[in-house]
Amino acid sequence: MDRMVNDNGIRINKFLSDAGVCSRREADRYIAEGKVMIDGKPAALGSRVYLDSKVTFKGKPVGIAGKKVLIAFNKPKGIVCTTDSRDPDNIIDYINFPVRIYPIGRLDKDSEGLILLTNDGSIVNGILRSRYDHEKEYIVTVNREITK
């Protein structure tokens, strides 16, 4: 993320997301609620963060994220690929990793297989954004003959 905080700065919601605090949408909500400060002043939607900025979230300092995390996880059936803690079967609580991570893409609850999780938004963008034109391949096993 340090390469993103340059002379032009980056938007506060992206800074918080890249720092592993929350998603950009969640950041916008926290900013509107007054829970984010930049240099001691309440942040506004669209505020920019610079290298010398001091950012706090709920009174705690937020710095440039530490080590980037990328986890390859063999998701079992019954686990939901969501960060929503209200879902008792969510993948984040199941893995219980000490740093905020989120899934790259998703697998259905009844599916099992490889899913990647990370705290690095640039990896997510590189994999999921359509402009990068990645081919997706799925291997499916069925329990009866396909006739059509």
Which residues does each PLM region occupy?
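Basic, flexible Lys/Arg- and Gly-enriched helix-loop patches that mediate nucleic-acid binding at interfaces
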Residues: 2-148
